[in-house]
């Protein structure tokens, strides 16, 4: 917890407050139509904190609570709210560069440690296509090589 309160607040604003605002405004537009979908993206930190990740974990825990509260409030109004926990990095150029900086080129050798964006999108699409008789609130996805 050796960081400034300003950093903690900024992380919370980006990872929790922004999600609340986006969800609120989305719901406001969907309610008159009597249907819709609002999906929040979580992370491993949505379920457990880690050393050095107090700000991020508290924000992701918070976003999960926002999503759950919105699901209970908006579900009866035919708006599907779900929280998707991504327990891994998503395979993008930025993530690959960051992994290489932190752990060297060998960090990129195992293709089973990052999720392709198309795989993540397929999970969101699966949620979107669900009939309301079997809505999922929370879905946790991870690549084959991720330890849990």
Where are these regions (language model features)?
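Catalytic Tyr-X3-Lys loop
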Residues: 4-20, 39, 63
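Active-site loop of short-chain dehydrogenase/reductase
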Residues: 8, 30-43, 76-79
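Short-chain dehydrogenase/reductase
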Residues: 12, 16, 52-61, 113-114
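Amphipathic alpha-helical dimer-interface segment in Rossmann-like NAD(P)H-dependent oxidoreductases
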Residues: 14-32
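Conserved catalytic-core motifs of eukaryotic protein kinase domains, centered on the activation segment
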Residues: 33, 50-51, 95
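Catalytic loop of short-chain dehydrogenase/reductase
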Residues: 37-62, 68, 72-75, 90
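C-terminal helical subdomain
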Residues: 76-79, 83-88, 102-148
């Amino acid at each position: 917890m050796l960081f400034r309160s300003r950093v903690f607040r900024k992380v919370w604003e980006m990872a929790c407050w922004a999600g609340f605002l986006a969800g609120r405004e989305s719901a406001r537009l969907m309610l008159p139509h009597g249907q819709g979908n609002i999906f929040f993206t979580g992370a491993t930190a949505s379920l457990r904190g880690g050393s050095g990740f107090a700000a991020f974990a508290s924000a992701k825990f918070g976003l999960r609570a926002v999503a759950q509260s919105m699901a209970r409030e908006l579900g009866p109004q035919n708006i599907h709210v779900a929280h998707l926990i991504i327990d891994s990095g998503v395979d993008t150029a930025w993530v690959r560069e960051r992994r290489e900086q932190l752990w060297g080129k060998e960090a990129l050798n195992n293709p089973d440690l990052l999720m392709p964006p198309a795989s993540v999108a397929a999970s969101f699409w699966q949620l979107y296509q669900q009939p309301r008789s079997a809505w999922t609130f929370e879905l946790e996805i991870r690549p084959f090589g991720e330890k849990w």
